[in-house]
């Protein structure tokens, strides 16, 4: 594979994913006073999609360049571990320990659950 095509695929996917995350953040601003719903929703959606797509593309061939676009670019741009970590740290920094631990626990446990749900949906309904 041409490395330049890989770079372009990741850059384009990253732009789309980052814009989607920004749109989610804007859409959740009204309800996101005490809890970072934008990051939470973007990360869970990314987990669901990686479960769906990874499972699906184990059986259906797609090019390496398109995989880079989807997984490294789009889903990498949509999800954000650094923002999640900073938001969690912010809870601890302000003494909101229950919210911090709750956010940490919910994000990790529901993220893993969404990957599993994505795999299940893909195997049960898409890969018959």
UniProtKB/Swiss-Prot annotation:
<feature type="binding site">
    <location>
        <position position="79"/>
    </location>
    <ligand>
        <name>Na(+)</name>
    </ligand>
</feature>
<feature type="binding site">
    <location>
        <position position="76"/>
    </location>
    <ligand>
        <name>Na(+)</name>
    </ligand>
</feature>
<keyword id="KW-0813">Transport</keyword>
<dbReference type="InterPro" id="IPR003691">
    <property type="entry name" value="FluC"/>
</dbReference>
<keyword id="KW-0407">Ion channel</keyword>
<protein>
    <recommendedName>
        <fullName>Fluoride-specific ion channel FluC</fullName>
    </recommendedName>
</protein>
<dbReference type="GO" id="GO:0140114">
    <property type="term" value="P:cellular detoxification of fluoride"/>
</dbReference>
<comment type="function">
    <text>Fluoride-specific ion channel. Important for reducing fluoride concentration in the cell, thus reducing its toxicity.</text>
</comment>
<feature type="transmembrane region" description="Helical">
    <location>
        <begin position="65"/>
        <end position="85"/>
    </location>
</feature>
<comment type="similarity">
    <text>Belongs to the fluoride channel Fluc/FEX (TC 1.A.43) family.</text>
</comment>
<dbReference type="GO" id="GO:0005886">
    <property type="term" value="C:plasma membrane"/>
</dbReference>
<keyword id="KW-1133">Transmembrane helix</keyword>
<dbReference type="Pfam" id="PF02537">
    <property type="entry name" value="CRCB"/>
</dbReference>
<keyword id="KW-0406">Ion transport</keyword>
<keyword id="KW-0915">Sodium</keyword>
<keyword id="KW-0472">Membrane</keyword>
<keyword id="KW-0479">Metal-binding</keyword>
<feature type="transmembrane region" description="Helical">
    <location>
        <begin position="37"/>
        <end position="57"/>
    </location>
</feature>
<feature type="transmembrane region" description="Helical">
    <location>
        <begin position="4"/>
        <end position="24"/>
    </location>
</feature>
<dbReference type="GO" id="GO:0062054">
    <property type="term" value="F:fluoride channel activity"/>
</dbReference>
<dbReference type="GO" id="GO:0046872">
    <property type="term" value="F:metal ion binding"/>
</dbReference>
<keyword id="KW-1003">Cell membrane</keyword>
<keyword id="KW-0997">Cell inner membrane</keyword>
<feature type="transmembrane region" description="Helical">
    <location>
        <begin position="101"/>
        <end position="121"/>
    </location>
</feature>
<keyword id="KW-0812">Transmembrane</keyword>
């Amino acid at each position: 594979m041409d490395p330049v095509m890989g770079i372009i695929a990741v850059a384009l996917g990253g732009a789309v994913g980052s814009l989607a995350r920004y749109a989610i953040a804007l859409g959740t601003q009204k309800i996101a006073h005490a809890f970072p719903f934008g990051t939470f929703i973007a990360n869970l959606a990314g987990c669901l999609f990686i479960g769906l797509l990874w499972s699906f593309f184990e059986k259906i061939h797609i090019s390496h360049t398109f995989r880079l676009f989807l997984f490294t670019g789009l889903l990498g741009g949509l999800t954000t571990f650094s923002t999640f970590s900073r938001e969690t740290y912010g809870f601890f920094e302000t003494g909101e320990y229950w919210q911090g631990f709750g956010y940490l626990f919910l994000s990790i446990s529901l993220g893993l659950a969404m990957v599993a749900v994505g795999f299940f949906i893909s195997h049960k309904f898409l890969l018959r």
